[in-house]
Amino acid sequence: MSMKALHLIFICLFFSIVTEAATVETVKVFSKSMNKEIPVVIVAPEKSEKPLRTVYLLHGYGGNANMWLGIKPNLPDIAERDGLLFVCPDGHNSWYWDSPKDPSSRYETFVSQELIEYIDTHYPTLPAKEGRAITGLSMGGHGALWIAFRHTETFGAAGSSSGGVDIRPFPKNWEMDKQLGSLEENRELWDSHTVINQIDKIKNGDLALIVDCGYGDFFFEVNNNFHAKLLENAINHDYIVRPGVHNGPYWKNSIDYQILFFLKYFQMN
């Protein structure tokens, strides 16, 4: 075979690989409720023979829309391999609440309504709860469960990795007082805005749930308590504990298991 022919084959293979790569783009999604544009990183497979299943990934405190790609650089490969659409919104340091203290911070409304509408309008998704999952790390773990528990008509599966699933033991941390006021003066708000107290709002079968946390994580105890309350309420869920602390290497590993869990849910629905 001539060198010219080999060169041609190489070029064809190269372009076939490129055309099958997932696309990564950052879009600005306008939030009517907050009257501003929100950056959102979207990882979409190049080809899909069926409507895309969507996984919403929420970042932690101090992060932004690029955080998940920084932790998991091969997210585009996973999107292409599994035919998944990953949506990573910028949640600022909001804890993904509609803040009762700051009317300009309405990230629950943004993620659960405005962003969903944008994604289902602009991408070939399955526009039903059976086609959507949501998860996140740390602050985003709390946010994902908070939103899913309160919008079971929108999401079919939800997860949390190292999530701050009970905020009350940490009243001085992560600017939560900007959203809720101080714990001392706003005990009822803190009680009603911690996701462990939202468990009573769901029933078994409303959501496919997966929760994980590392043994060395400062959120380990509250995750154990969260798991215990789910058991007490007879809510089926996967609960995974493994060696690890509150950092990127832990989440780089844990997200693989969550994606596998969501894939199984999508395949069954």
Predicted features and spans:
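Non-catalytic cap/lid and distal C-terminal segments of serine-dependent acyl enzymes
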Residues: 21-269
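Positively charged n-region of N-terminal signal peptides that target proteins for export
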Residues: 1-7
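Bacterial N-terminal signal peptides
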Residues: 7-16
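Short, intrinsically disordered, low-complexity terminal segments
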Residues: 2, 18-19
